[in-house]
Structure formats: C-alpha cells, structure tokens
Amino acid sequence: MKLFLVLIILLFEVLTDGARLKKCFNNITGYCRKKCKVGERYEIGCLSGKLCCVNDEEEKKHVSFKKPHQHSGEKLSVQQDYIILPTITIFAV
C-alpha cells in the first residue's frame, strides 16, 4: 500500500523543465537549454545558467518580420511651420 502511495505521488510530480522549455528574454526567439541542437547557435546566457539557443532559420524570419520598411534615399519635401523638439517628462527621468 505504501508503494502504491509513493507511485501515485511520483506520477503527479511535475518536473521544472519537463513540460516546456523556457524562452529567452530580451525578445530573442530562442529557448534555454543545456546544449544547443544542430543548426542552432548560442546567443546569450539564460538566468538559470543555461544557454540561449537560437535557431538560425527562425531568427531570420523573426528579424525580417520585425524590420521596419526603410525608404531608399527619398527625402520628404514637405515644409513644416514649426520645429519638433525632443521633450523630457518627469516620469522619463
């Protein structure tokens, strides 16, 4: 009976890294692992002391999606009546 109770407790035990891999921080499309897989590269360290492994193909898709459209040397010919100055608020300091 004791063995049965121990078996039930072990079945409901959830491992910390078993269910899902933790994602890396700072908007990096990678996962924290002990070793990187083939086709992945090491980006930065995770908080848990593991490596942040980034898949090269997924990173290219992510960077091209987030990259804003740049104008090819075109200058705007619109004249403004005022000058836009940078402002600093109390909350920004």
From Swiss-Prot:
Disulfide bonds join 24-52, 32-46, 36-53. Keywords: Antibiotic, Antimicrobial, Defensin, Disulfide bond, Secreted, Signal. It is found in: Secreted. The keyword Disulfide bond applies. Residues 1-18 form the signal peptide. One of its GO terms (cellular component) is extracellular region. The keyword Disulfide bond applies. One of its GO terms (biological process) is innate immune response. Pfam families: Defensin_beta_2. Belongs to the beta-defensin family. PANTHER family: BETA-DEFENSIN 123, BETA-DEFENSIN 123-RELATED. Has antibacterial activity. This is Beta-defensin 128.
